[in-house]
Regions:
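A cross-family detector of function-defining hotspots
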Residues: 57, 143-191, 200-253
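N-terminal helix-cap/turn-to-beta initiation motif at the start of protein domains
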Residues: 38-56, 66-68, 136-146
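Beta-sheet ligand-binding and adhesion/scaffold domains
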Residues: 27, 33-46, 58-61, 72, ...
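Positively charged n-region of N-terminal signal peptides that target proteins for export
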Residues: 1-5
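N-terminal glycine/threonine-rich, aromatic-flanked beta-hairpin/loop signature
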Residues: 54-100, 186-188
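Bacterial N-terminal signal peptides
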Residues: 8-15
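N-terminal signal peptide c-region/cleavage motif recognized by signal peptidases
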Residues: 17-19
Length: 253
C-alpha cells in the first residue's frame, strides 16, 4: 500500500464510504485520479503532522495512512474546527476518486496509546496488536468493549461522560470509560476487589506503594478536595496514573 495512492477502500473498511470501491474495482491508475487540488493552507499539514504514519484497526489491518496533507493518499481540500492543543480535533474534507468526503478526526494519547478516533466511533491504533504495560483486573487501555464484556459481563449502568461512554460495575466498585469503542480509562473505588495486575495494588493501597512499584518520580499526592483528580503520573508506554480521595485510575491521559 503506497501513501501516494488514494485508497478509498481503506476508508470504506471503517464504514466511511459508500459505495465501496472494493465492490466496483477500478484500475490503480484510475483510483489515483482526483479532480480537486490540495488545499494550500498549511493548517491541515500542521494538524496532521503528529498523526503522520500508518494506523491500524482493531483487527490489526492497515486502515489509514497519513502523510503531509494527505489521508490515504487523498489530498485534504478543506479543514474546519481544528484545535491544535491536546487532545486535538478537526474536520477534514478529502478528495477521493468518487468525490469528496469529510472526516472528523480526534487525536489523543501518548506513545503506544496514541489513538485516532474517526467520526467519533472508530478507533485506530499505531500497532497491529494492542500494546500496553499495565492492566487492571485484566482490562488494558485500548481493549475493546466486546473483550471487556466477555470478562465482566454488561455493566450495571452506562452513561455519557465528557464525550466518553462510562460503564459502572457496582459489584466490583469499578468504572470503565470508552471512546471509539476502546478503553480509555479504568477507575477503582476504595473497597474494590480489583487490583492492578503488575503491581497487585488496589484502590486502598498507600501512595508510597504505587511510587515504589512504578518507579515514579514522586509519591502521588491525594487532592485535598473531594471530586478533584490529581495530575497525571507517568507510567511506561504512555500510560497515566491518577488518584482522588475516592479512587485510583489508569488512563490514556
Amino acid at each position: 500500500m503506497k501513501a501516494t495512492t488514494c485508497i478509498a477502500c481503506a476508508v470504506c473498511a471503517l464504514g466511511l464510504t459508500a459505495p465501496c470501491l472494493a465492490e466496483e474495482p477500478l484500475p490503480a491508475a484510475a483510483a489515483a485520479v482526483v479532480s480537486v487540488q490540495p488545499a494550500q493552507d498549511e493548517s491541515a499539514a500542521s494538524w496532521l503532522e503528529p498523526a503522520a504514519g500508518e494506523w491500524y484497526d482493531l483487527k490489526g489491518e492497515l486502515a489509514m495512512t497519513i502523510s503531509g496533507s494527505t489521508i490515504n493518499g487523498c489530498p485534504v481540500t478543506a479543514e474546519a474546527n481544528c484545535t491544535y492543543g491536546y487532545p486535538r480535533t478537526g474536520h477534514f474534507t478529502i478528495s477521493e476518486s468518487q468525490g469528496t468526503r469529510t472526516l472528523t478526526l480526534d487525536l489523543l494519547g501518548h506513545k503506544s496509546h496514541q489513538y485516532l478516533i474517526v467520526d467519533g466511533k472508530t478507533a485506530l491504533r499505531r500497532s497491529i496488536h494492542p500494546e500496553y504495560s499495565e492492566s487492571v483486573g485484566g482490562i488494558y487501555l485500548g481493549m475493546t468493549k466486546d473483550d471487556v464484556t466477555a470478562k465482566y459481563g454488561y455493566p450495571n449502568e452506562i452513561t455519557a461522560d465528557q464525550g466518553m461512554e462510562h460503564w459502572s460495575y457496582g459489584l466490583h466498585r469499578m468504572d470503565v470509560f470508552f471512546q471509539g469503542g476502546i478503553v480509555m480509562a479504568v477507575r477503582l473505588y476504595k473497597g474494590s476487589d480489583i487490583k492492578f495486575d503488575k503491581s497487585g495494588l488496589g484502590a486502598d493501597a498507600a501512595m508510597a506503594a504505587y511510587a515504589e512499584a512504578y518507579k515514579l518520580a514522586a509519591v502521588p499526592v491525594i487532592p485535598a478536595d473531594d471530586g478533584v483528580l490529581s495530575p497525571a503520573y507517568d507510567l511506561p508506554q504512555g500510560e497515566k496514573f491518577h488518584v482522588s480521595q475516592r479512587y485510583v485510575q489508569l488512563s490514556v491521559d
